[in-house]
Amino acid sequence: MTLQWAAVATFLYAEIGLILIFCLPFIPPQRWQKIFSFNVWGKIATFWNKAFLTIIILLIVLFLDAVREVRKYSSVHTIEKSSTSRPDAYEHTQMKLFRSQRNLYISGFSLFFWLVLRRLVTLITQLAKELSNKGVLKTQAENTNKAAKKFMEENEKLKRILKSHGKDEECVLEAENKKLVEDQQKLKTELRKTSDALSKAQNDVMEMKMQSERLSKEYDQLLKEHSELQDRLERGNKKRL
């Protein structure tokens, strides 16, 4: 294996390792969000898009070169099989055909996993943000609910005080009671708004989960199509034999 293909194979193994780490169930998206928020990522963010596109271009070039090599040695393979003047040419061509097919798979999967890795990081970041917003809205709803209960308890206390005191303080207590009722209504309105926002955040999280499931299905479909293409290529090689 030449130096360039050894580097591509190492890059492929690194991609597989990162994808497996991202898919670990016991690491929450919020933890990944904290890792992605490090200052070092902000410093290299300006070069990230350029590096991403550069790697894609390099992998596409290597993939097309591997396709060219496969087609080249597949055609030569048929010619040298019928020739008896060079008995070692057939084995030599078979070896080169095997290497070109190996390089084709390495470059193809490296390109595919590179795109999957970019999409996976984006989905993890979006999911972490939605979960954070959900937690904030839930905390606000709980605080509003506690405040509403507190005002209701104070209202009950004022009612008991009104019964125990004489009619002289009745007007003042009624005014305070009315004010507390108004505050209670305001808090209920805020609680309703917060509950609606929390429901919206939950719907957004469900949409993110559905989008992640669709991406997983598309990934499985691509692997299935790649296996079918590989089987067809192997059957074509067997027919040439």
From Swiss-Prot:
**From what superkingdom does this record's organism come?**
Eukaryota
Ranges for region Disordered: 193-223
Output the GO biological process annotations, alphabetical, semicolon-separated. Answer: apoptotic process; endoplasmic reticulum to Golgi vesicle-mediated transport; intracellular protein transport; protein localization to endoplasmic reticulum exit site
Tell me how this protein sits in the membrane. Multi-pass membrane protein
**Lumenal compartment spans:** 1-6, 65-103
* Topological domains annotated Cytoplasmic: 28-43, 125-241
Q: Which GO terms describe its cellular component?
A: endoplasmic reticulum membrane
Protein name per UniProt:
B-cell receptor-associated protein 29
Q: What is the organism of origin for this protein?
A: Pongo abelii
